[in-house]
């Protein structure tokens, strides 16, 4: 009898416990008899999902690495009128040195268009006219504050719009935009108040309504640093005069469309800020300074993801139990020796920038952590509760070696 046939499954599995994953695979491939035992062997090291997904025993791999790369669109920066735009370029960047009008400049093959901050400062006037931007462009990034955009200049094909200009009025933003981000230093307003007075049966009726410049199609809205709190909406006082007596009624109306589900605010946050947040918002980023204590009853009930500027803000806001994901934006070196607790109902934490937060914040039930790759340049601590780790950066084997054994899923995500 062949010695291979004498080894039962239990013996083979026991032997596998003393081998690395690579050695296990090499051993199983020695002969067909051993290979038939592959469904009984567990693999404990990290393996790329792309390499194991087609294996019939892929479920036996406990720790998996996912790599999410950014779509590479060929780009070209236009700085001079004599520059030749490549035929295969899809992303055109109007550089800071370009000083001409955009008329007859942008080829029809361009799907992504970026206009840099300095463009328009030396053009008098700095205007974008209709039909200058092709109706094939879907991603438009207007960084310049010096540009006046005429009605119809932004084509209906645009779905993702970064609006850095200070000048905005009705019907400038097309109705197909789903992602709208205003520039960090853009000072434009997003709506206006309209007052109408009329006589009804010898009664003077004053009606106030608002007109938002943001289309109903927008689902994700990002308001910049320099935009006033008045951008959120209006408190309207309507007055009716009956039998010589004036009756006032107050109505709160928001400039933010009802269909917005993701909202980012960089303004100072007060209790009345929440009066203008639509009920459909599920992801709310409060990246401005919180000026008052915020009770959980004030926060809209549908919010499941909450973003804060820094983890010190945990002292200023009581997070509702329905919120399961918490995002921190800024890095902060805490001088306060007090240790902060993350609420037990939070299961996912995302850290944009961070010092060694884990020395100052207690993580209770955090299963998912999202963090920048530079965090691993030092030997720093990760909570043992983490099961899924997302790293914003490129795939790095050195990082994998620093991770605790408790992590089962690792995701490298392009910034």
Swiss-Prot record:
**Matches recorded under Pfam families:** FNIP
FNIP repeats located where?
148-185
Task: Please state what the protein is called.
Answer: Putative FNIP repeat-containing protein L415
Taxonomic lineage is: Viruses, Varidnaviria, Bamfordvirae, Nucleocytoviricota, Megaviricetes
């Amino acid at each position: 009898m062949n010695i291979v046939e004498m080894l039962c499954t239990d013996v083979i599995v026991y032997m596998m416990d003393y081998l690395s994953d690579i050695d296990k695979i090499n051993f199983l491939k020695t002969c067909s008899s051993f290979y038939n035992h592959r469904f009984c062997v567990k693999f404990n090291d990290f393996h790329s999902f792309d390499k194991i997904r087609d294996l019939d025993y892929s479920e036996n791999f406990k720790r998996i690495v996912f790599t999410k790369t950014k779509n590479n669109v060929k780009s070209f920066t236009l700085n001079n009128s004599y520059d030749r735009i490549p035929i295969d370029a899809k992303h055109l960047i109007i550089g800071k040195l370009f000083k001409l009008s955009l008329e007859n400049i942008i080829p029809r093959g361009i799907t992504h268009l970026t206009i840099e901050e300095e463009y328009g400062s030396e053009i008098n006037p700095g205007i974008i006219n209709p039909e200058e931007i092709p109706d094939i462009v879907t991603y438009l990034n207007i960084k310049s504050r010096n540009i006046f955009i005429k009605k119809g200049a932004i084509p209906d094909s645009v779905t993702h719009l970064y609006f850095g200009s200070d000048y905005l009025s009705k019907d400038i933003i097309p109705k197909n935009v789903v992602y709208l981000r205003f520039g960090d230093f853009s000072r434009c307003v997003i709506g206006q108040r309209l007052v109408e007075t009329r006589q009804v049966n010898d009664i003077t009726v004053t009606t106030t309504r608002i007109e938002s410049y943001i289309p109903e199609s927008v689902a994700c809205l990002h308001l910049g640093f320099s935009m006033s709190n008045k951008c959120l909406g209006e408190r309207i006082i309507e007055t009716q005069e009956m039998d010589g007596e004036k009756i006032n009624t107050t109505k709160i109306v928001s400039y933010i469309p009802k269909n917005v589900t993701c909202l980012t605010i960089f303004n100072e946050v007060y209790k009345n800020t929440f009066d203008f947040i639509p009920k459909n918002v599920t992801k709310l980023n409060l990246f401005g300074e919180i000026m008052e204590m915020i009770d959980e009853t004030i926060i809209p009930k549908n919010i499941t993801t909450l973003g804060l500027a820094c983890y010190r803000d945990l002292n200023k806001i009581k997070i509702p139990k329905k919120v399961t994901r918490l995002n921190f934006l800024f890095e902060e070196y805490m001088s306060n020796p007090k240790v902060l607790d993350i609420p037990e109902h939070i299961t996912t934490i995302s850290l944009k920038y961070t010092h060694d937060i884990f020395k100052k914040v207690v993580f209770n039930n955090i299963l998912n952590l999202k963090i920048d790759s530079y965090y691993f340049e030092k030997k720093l601590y990760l909570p043992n509760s983490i099961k899924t780790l997302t790293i914003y950066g490129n795939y790095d084997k050195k990082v994998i070696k620093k991770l605790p054994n408790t992590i089962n899923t690792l995701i490298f995500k392009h910034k």
